[in-house]
């Protein structure tokens, strides 16, 4: 399984759209794909015409198994949706032991070929979990000063994650 994180410290640069587009392409090529919304805005669900739901909250805070919280979009494409309850996920992770690896641990035995993480444009414990779980980080951006600054910030954070021993592919 490969894990891709879509990250930028700047909002509105195309993280969600990029994640949805890649997930669509992978699933159409029969690659079993899971999208996980780590953003409290819950835009991944909206991208598929679904209502926001507390899938991530149920997975992390209520310890429900992954297969109970996924929504199947179509064959080879599943979603763990997010909503405002994602803020509670951040608090739960903050109180946990080994908090930086919670997402990695939850995904360890996931039955997918690819997992795509849509990260919020913030730097918090959930964002860090996404970066640590990722094999690859995709940084969508626009050609403007604020978006480029967001790229610099995420690259700095990734370097810090690598200093702790994590290696991106």
State what each model feature region is:
Residues 1-169:
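P-loop NTP-binding core
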């Amino acid at each position: 399984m490969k894990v891709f994180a879509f990250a930028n410290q700047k909002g509105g640069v195309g993280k969600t759209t990029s994640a949805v587009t890649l997930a669509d392409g992978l699933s159409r090529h029969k690659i079993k794909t899971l999208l996980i919304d780590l953003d409290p805005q819950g835009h991944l669900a909206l991208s598929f015409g679904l209502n926001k739901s507390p899938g991530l909250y149920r997975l992390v805070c209520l310890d429900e198994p992954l297969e109970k919280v996924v929504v199947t979009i179509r064959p080879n494409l599943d979603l763990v949706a997010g909503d405002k309850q994602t803020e509670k996920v951040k608090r739960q992770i903050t109180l946990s032991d080994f908090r930086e690896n919670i997402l990695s641990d939850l995904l360890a035995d996931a039955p997918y070929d690819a997992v795509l993480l849509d990260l919020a444009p913030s730097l918090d414990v959930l964002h860090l979990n996404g970066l640590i779980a990722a094999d690859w980080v995709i940084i969508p951006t626009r050609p403007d000063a604020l978006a480029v600054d967001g790229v610099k910030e995420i690259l700095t954070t990734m370097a810090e994650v690598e200093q702790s021993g994590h290696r991106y592919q």
